Amino acid sequence: SSCPGKSSWPHLVGVGGSVAKAIIERQNPNVKAVILEEGTPVTKDFRCNRVRIWVNKRGLVVSPPRIG
């Protein structure tokens, strides 16, 4: 992607959502990480300053967080 800084975090799958949020925002200060339960409807727009963290009912990351 053409967004500045780190853009994906595949190693965070299985980690707690709040831990993942802290790591992502520390590694790329340009983004705001948002924790969402899988299945939550979201907009389809692409934004360089957003990372969606998809978690299951136990709050664990279920897919690699990435910019968008």
UniProtKB/Swiss-Prot annotation:
Biological process according to GO: response to wounding
Keyword set includes Disulfide bond: yes
Keyword check for Acetylation: yes
Site (described: Reactive bond): K44, D45
UniProt cross-references to InterPro entries, sorted A to Z: Prot_inh_pot1, Prot_inh_pot1_sf
SUPFAM superfamilies: CI-2 family of serine protease inhibitors (SSF54654)
Residue pairs linked by disulfide bridges in the UniProt entry: C3-C48
Superkingdom per UniProt: Eukaryota
One Gene Ontology term of the molecular function aspect: serine-type endopeptidase inhibitor activity
Transmembrane stretches, start-end: none
Residues recorded with modification N-acetylserine: S1
Matches recorded under Gene3D superfamilies: Trypsin Inhibitor V, subunit A
Keyword annotations: Acetylation, Disulfide bond, Protease inhibitor, Serine protease inhibitor
Function, as annotated: Specifically inhibits both trypsin and activated Hageman factor.
Family: Belongs to the protease inhibitor I13 (potato type I serine protease inhibitor) family.
Protein name (record): Inhibitor of trypsin and hageman factor
Species the sequence originates in: Cucurbita maxima (Pumpkin)
